[in-house]
Design a protein with these regions (language model features):
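Extracytoplasmic cell-surface/polysaccharide-interacting catalytic and binding patches
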Residues: 1-47, 145-154
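Amphipathic alpha-helical interface surfaces
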Residues: 38-42, 65, 81, 95, ...
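A broad, low-specificity signal marking well-ordered, structured residues that form hydrophobic/aromatic
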Residues: 54, 83, 124-125
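Extended, low-complexity, intrinsically disordered C-terminal regulatory tails
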Residues: 41-70
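Catalytic cores and adjacent binding grooves of peptidoglycan-active enzymes
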Residues: 87-154
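Active-site microenvironments of hydrolase-like enzyme catalytic domains
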Residues: 69-85
Length: 154
């Protein structure tokens, strides 16, 4: 099933953990609508801008899957409002930093997170989108005392 021009349902629900543990990762109808919205409003625009495939490393997570991986109970992945994009290592000249900057400077989003990495490039990019209620919050994820901490991106 296609969610948008460039995104399939299989792509955003794919999970090795779900397969391995026999966990259903099927979105509810409401979550499916959210996935369609973020795919059209964010992902497709990133894909069109760069003109190369963009890779989703994490999309939708059912409550059971989120618990199995130790994810945050308040994560927007749980309701189909977030995607993690990891462009590095695909040999098409587009980096995670390129994706991060394009989203930050050009698109509507609720939350954009520069996930770990170095000052020059994040390990991946988390982007959340809420229909009609976007905060444009830009954060950086860092490790502090063995725990993840979110600080304003500078």
């Amino acid at each position: 099933m296609k969610l948008s021009k460039y995104v399939s349902l299989a792509e955003v629900t794919r999970s090795d953990t779900a397969k391995r543990k026999g966990i259903s990762n099927e979105p509810t109808p409401e979550h499916l609508e959210n996935l369609k919205t973020i795919s059209e409003e964010v992902f497709d625009k990133v894909r069109e801008h760069f003109g190369v495939p963009i890779f989703i490393s994490s999309g939708y997570r059912s409550a059971a899957l989120n618990k199995a991986i130790g994810g945050s109970a308040t994560s927007d992945h749980n309701n189909g409002r977030a995607l993690d994009l990891d462009q590095d290592g695909h040999g098409n000249g587009v980096t995670n930093m390129d994706v991060f900057k394009f989203i930050k400077d050009n698109l509507e989003f609720d939350q954009l997170i520069y996930e770990f990495g170095t000052d020059k490039n994040p390990d991946w990019v988390h982007v959340g989108y809420r229909k009609g209620a976007n905060r444009k919050q830009v954060l950086r994820a860092i490790k502090e005392g063995g725990k993840t901490k979110y600080v304003p991106y500078k």
